[in-house]
């Protein structure tokens, strides 16, 4: 790791507060020195913040694709009996409903977090914003993972069925339905991976200041 | 938040490195001052680390309970036909198998992480350990959530069935099976909440040093 480079970091407001509290007489020259010297790892932090912003854009694309693909999935089979038509829609299955709601919330959250991510590009040492982002990212990671995993369990069942519980595989009839649902699940797992990366990167950025 | 108290934090090794790099002539008195004064927020950090350790113990209990409850679930109905007996076991359903594996892995990881958590009680400012813990906790949060959510989707189906996919509710027959499976799912969600808390607390602990 780059802890060697980080060891020379100086956080200006903190140094000032610390110096005021402890050694007021030598406070002024220290502050002057730190202000004159550019941050040694500001570039590294800025790179991390820019990557964070780009990852958020990718995650918006992934969650939006997942939510809309799942939310518009609807297949009516071309044959029907006297009493009912065979139709499969995402809102027949509560797990798919939850998936749409969870990925839509994640997508909205990501859009709202973009300005905060932008601020941390220009102020790489603002710890409050980083902390806010890492906490809400953790919650959203859990939400997106829950949506993706529950939908996966149902998609697996739709593909393979389960003989012991007497649940039949419906994908033999509803091929298009199963295909788009599987696509949505894959997109949501991409979003899960991105959320994990976002949390880890925020942790790295919080490490030194 | 306690940012007012944190603003006076001084990290001894970093202050020394920083002082050496920037202003060697006034480095010695500063280090002497900081060494004489105890850490203002060392107690707060230590409390956080102790709470982290206790939460890990609770999470071990929750994941162990979830894994063993699910892993020993097996119900044979008291009636049978000529050809087969009605039996429900967790390993009939892949989602339940995944649940057992995921919670068992989380449980093992938590046991392995205890020594690291202990070290960070005695050395609240060791950032490398915190960073290691937050990154692996994030991965485990995703794993445990995935296991819990996929099992929930199947448990919901077992309780309610799904008319459009023609999947019947099996809980009317397998009442004991469904009860213990539901208990395991609840325990795993407790573990998920604890993992989220662990990640957030590590983020807080990384914030200032």
From Swiss-Prot, chains A, B:
Q: What is this protein called?
A: Casparian strip membrane protein 1
> Transmembrane residues, as ranges?
47-67, 96-116, 138-158, 184-204
Which residue ranges are assigned to the Extracellular compartment in the record's topology? 68-95, 159-183
Q: Name one GO biological process term.
A: cell-cell junction assembly
Q: Where in the cell is it found?
A: Cell membrane
Keyword Glycoprotein on this protein? no
- What family is reported? Belongs to the Casparian strip membrane proteins (CASP) family.
Pfam families according to UniProt = CASP_dom
Cytoplasmic side of membrane: 1-46, 117-137, 205-209
Recorded superkingdom: Eukaryota
Membrane topology term: Multi-pass membrane protein
Report the source organism. Vitis vinifera
Q: How does it assemble?
A: Homodimer and heterodimers.
Q: Which InterPro entries match?
A: CASP/CASPL (IPR006459), CASP_dom (IPR006702), CASPL (IPR044173)
Function of the molecule: Regulates membrane-cell wall junctions and localized cell wall deposition. Required for establishment of the Casparian strip membrane domain (CSD) and the subsequent formation of Casparian strips, a cell wall modification of the root endodermis that determines an apoplastic barrier between the intraorganismal apoplasm and the extraorganismal apoplasm and prevents lateral diffusion.
The UniProt entry's GO CC annotations, sorted and at most eight, read:
Casparian strip; plasma membrane
Recite the UniProt keywords alphabetically: Cell membrane, Cell wall biogenesis/degradation, Membrane, Transmembrane, Transmembrane helix
């Amino acid at each position: 790791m780059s802890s060697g480079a980080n060891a020379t970091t100086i956080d200006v407001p903190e140094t000032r507060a610390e110096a005021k509290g402890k050694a007021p007489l030598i406070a002024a020259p220290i502050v002057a020195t730190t202000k004159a010297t550019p941050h040694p790892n500001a570039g590294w932090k800025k790179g991390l913040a820019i990557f964070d912003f780009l990852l958020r854009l990718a995650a918006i694309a992934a969650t939006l694709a997942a939510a809309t693909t799942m939310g518009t999935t609807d297949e009516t089979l071309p044959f029907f009996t006297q009493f009912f038509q065979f139709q499969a829609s995402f809102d027949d299955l509560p797990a798919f409903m939850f998936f749409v709601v969870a990925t839509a919330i994640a997508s909205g959250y990501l859009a709202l977090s973009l300005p905060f991510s932008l601020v941390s590009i220009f102020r790489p040492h603002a710890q409050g914003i980083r902390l806010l982002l890492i906490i809400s990212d953790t919650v959203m990671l859990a939400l997106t993972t829950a949506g993706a995993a529950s939908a996966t369990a149902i998609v697996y069942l739709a593909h393979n069925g389960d003989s012991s519980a007497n649940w039949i595989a419906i994908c033999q009839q509803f091929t298009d339905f199963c295909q788009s649902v599987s696509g949505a699940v894959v997109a949501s797992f991409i979003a899960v991976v991105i959320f994990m990366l976002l949390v880890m990167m925020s942790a790295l950025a919080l490490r030194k200041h």
